[in-house]
Amino acid sequence: MMRQKVRIPSILSALFFALCGLMSLYLTYKTAGNLLDSDASSELVLARLLADTNQILSRDWFYSTELRVLNTQLIYMPLFKIFSDWKLVRFFGALLLQAILVLSYYFLSRQAGFSRNVFFLTGGLLLLPASTPYARIVLLHSYYVPH
């Protein structure tokens, strides 16, 4: 007996993607001002220093754990030029980095020949805060997006 493929309507996969995006947006908004993590906060401190000195690289910064030259500060630094509120910078920076993550995955999925339906289903999973470590490391702190 042959198994039939289950076809999910495109509207359902797009709806799933939108729902996951909204969940990530809500989580990012609720936690943007409450992340007390030295590594994540040091990225914002560096970005603020770069914004205040109008530089992309700084000679006055000593990295605590690793050398991060082209990283999240390239997103956060221009946001400090717009907003003075650190919570807003973290919120919009995380959203921009999540958008970059999804757009880069969209490019990969199209190059791999995936349908848009598959992209919406799997791209939604990228934005889904399925566990605390994934939500903190990837979605909120955006550690692996620039890599």
Predicted feature descriptions by range:
Residues 22-41, 134-136:
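Helix-to-loop transition at the C-terminal end of transmembrane segments
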Residues 36, 69, 116-147:
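Membrane-interface micro-motifs in multi-pass membrane enzymes
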Residues 44-49:
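Extracytosolic (periplasmic/ER-lumenal) interhelical loops and adjacent juxtamembrane/interface segments
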Residues 92-117:
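Transmembrane-helix motifs of polytopic, lipid-linked glycan transferases
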